[in-house]
């Protein structure tokens, strides 16, 4: 592929002249694609409002016009859906593309990359972790891609967002980390906020937070309201009315409250269900749920999981709706039917039919554990998990062989019940990768001694989840920039 031809096609896919930074990124990309090094990789960093999304979409369109095979990936289902919408072609979650089910013992292992001459593009790469028990997601992603013949990887992300839990920075966006894998790194960073983005109060204030972060100034940012209609302060006594208005205007699925803790998210979820949606039952039709623990039991994936047949621009043999191989932590679901609520083993369960909006409304009926809905813990605690294990195993005490008892346990619907929470409010890590029309940010009580770079990452990530309207809940006056006379 001739670099000049590719440059011409990318520029043409823009529809308007690229900025100087975008031109440089295009040059880096064409050099990356022309590099004969078999382990070349590219990092494209860009903060909100810098045109990263526009550039990535132009690259996808240009590559497809050249008949180049692509696989678009993202860390979560909602992030994959967003990537698919702006790129104009199918995108998949990383986990569902690179792992396959073990045939006998259950669980998943790294799959085989059948693709060749394929570019893998990963959006929201700031969420890809290096930590983990044994091999990390970044380890497996790199191994999977470069095990394919003449395949290469492009990582796209915003390094101002929250890094993965337990990390100080986002490892997938660090050239030093990628170089340690023996990869030849090409990189480009977009930092200039585009003129049209400066008209957005959401992006203006997110950029102010980003500047504080990179200037090394840990101070409470002042929110600028003057001249913007898309950022508003919501006092506590107006929150119910304002949230109800958002639900009426854009819907439950386009409104999200972002909080700093599971405890706060739980309080908001209960308040929203009781005082706005008037839902008195434990779980109702129409309730929005979030899966809080990976579950491999309820979906039986296909025996083979080839990436070669799932390139962008083709008709995938398995789209996310047809090839959902497991239910992932962070997946969103909508309750369609609730029946047979009952107590067993000291826990409460229900049979729930639900659809998954980020996977073309894939429908599933499963046993759901109700106890996690309102608990302050992220999922079942270790003690609760051990209690459930012990109680279920008692039912199989008549099976003489331990291996057969363990097999029965793995096939037990109660031990494998879905762990869920309500999804009207969530922590920032849970919301990361997704976008909603209306975002409500609850930072809780803040003092100067609570300031840190982590807080600024959190605030920036929370702000940039909003696409239309940002509401700041109970925001202190000391954090609001006074209007100029």
Task: Give the ranges of each region predicted by the language model.
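Short, solvent-exposed amphipathic alpha-helical segments in soluble enzyme
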Residues: 88, 272-275, 456-460
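Conserved helicase motor core of P-loop NTPases
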Residues: 5-6, 25, 29-30, 37, ...
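Conserved pre-motif I regulatory segment
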Residues: 2-40
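Conserved SAM-binding loop
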Residues: 18, 72, 257
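ASCE P-loop NTPase helicase motor core
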Residues: 27, 31, 36-219, 224-226
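C-terminal accessory regions
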Residues: 331, 346-485
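Short, conserved phosphate/pyrophosphate- and ester-handling motifs at nucleotide-, phospho-/glycolipid
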Residues: 22, 76, 261, 433
């Amino acid at each position: 592929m001739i670099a000049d031809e590719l440059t011409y096609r990318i520029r043409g896919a823009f529809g308007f002249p690229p900025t100087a930074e975008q031109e440089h990124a295009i040059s880096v990309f064409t050099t990356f694609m022309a590099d004969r090094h078999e382990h070349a990789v590219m990092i494209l960093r860009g903060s909100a409002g810098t045109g990263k999304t526009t550039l990535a979409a132009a690259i996808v369109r240009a590559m497809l016009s050249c008949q180049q095979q692509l696989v678009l990936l993202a860390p979560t289902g909602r992030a994959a859906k967003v990537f698919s919408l702006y790129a104009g072609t199918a995108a998949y979650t990383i986990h569902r593309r690179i792992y396959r089910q073990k045939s006998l013992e259950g669980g998943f292992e790294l799959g085989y990359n059948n693709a060749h001459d394929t570019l893998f593009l990963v959006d929201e790469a700031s969420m890809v972790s290096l930590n983990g028990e044994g091999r990390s997601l970044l380890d497996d992603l790199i191994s999977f891609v470069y095990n394919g013949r003449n395949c290469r990887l492009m990582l796209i992300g915003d390094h101002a967002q929250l890094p993965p839990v337990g990390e100080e920075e986002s490892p997938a966006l660090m050239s030093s980390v990628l170089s340690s894998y023996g990869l030849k790194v090409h990189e480009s960073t977009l930092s200039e906020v585009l003129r049209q983005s400066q008209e957005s109060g959401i992006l203006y204030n997110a950029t102010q937070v980003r500047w504080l972060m990179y200037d090394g100034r840990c101070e409470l940012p002042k929110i600028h309201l003057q001249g913007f209609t898309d950022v508003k302060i919501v006092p506590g006594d107006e929150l119910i009315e304002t949230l109800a208005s958002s639900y009426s205007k854009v819907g439950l699925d386009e409104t999200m409250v972002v909080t700093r803790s599971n405890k706060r998210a739980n309080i908001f979820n209960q308040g929203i269900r009781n005082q706005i949606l008037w839902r008195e039952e434990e779980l109702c039709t129409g309730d929005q749920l979030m899966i809080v623990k990976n579950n491999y039991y309820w979906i039986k994936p296909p025996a083979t999981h080839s990436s070669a047949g799932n390139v962008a621009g083709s008709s995938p043999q398995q789209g996310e709706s047809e090839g959902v191989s497991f239910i992932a932590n962070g997946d969103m679901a909508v309750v369609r039917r609730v029946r047979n609520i009952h107590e067993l083993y000291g826990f409460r369960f229900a049979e729930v039919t639900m659809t998954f909006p980020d996977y073309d409304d894939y429908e599933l009926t499963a046993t759901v554990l109700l106890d996690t809905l309102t608990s302050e813990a992220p999922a079942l605690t270790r003690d609760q998990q051990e209690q459930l294990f012990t109680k279920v195993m008692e039912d199989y005490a008549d099976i003489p062989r331990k291996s057969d008892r363990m097999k029965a346990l793995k096939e037990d619907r109660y031990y494998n019940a879905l762990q869920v929470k309500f999804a009207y409010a969530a922590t920032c890590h849970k919301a990361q990768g997704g976008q909603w029309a209306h975002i409500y940010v609850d930072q809780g009580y803040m003092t100067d001694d609570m300031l840190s770079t982590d807080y600024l990452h959190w605030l920036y990530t929370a702000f940039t989840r909003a696409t239309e309207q940002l509401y700041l809940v109970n925001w202190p006056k000391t954090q609001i920039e006074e209007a100029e006379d």
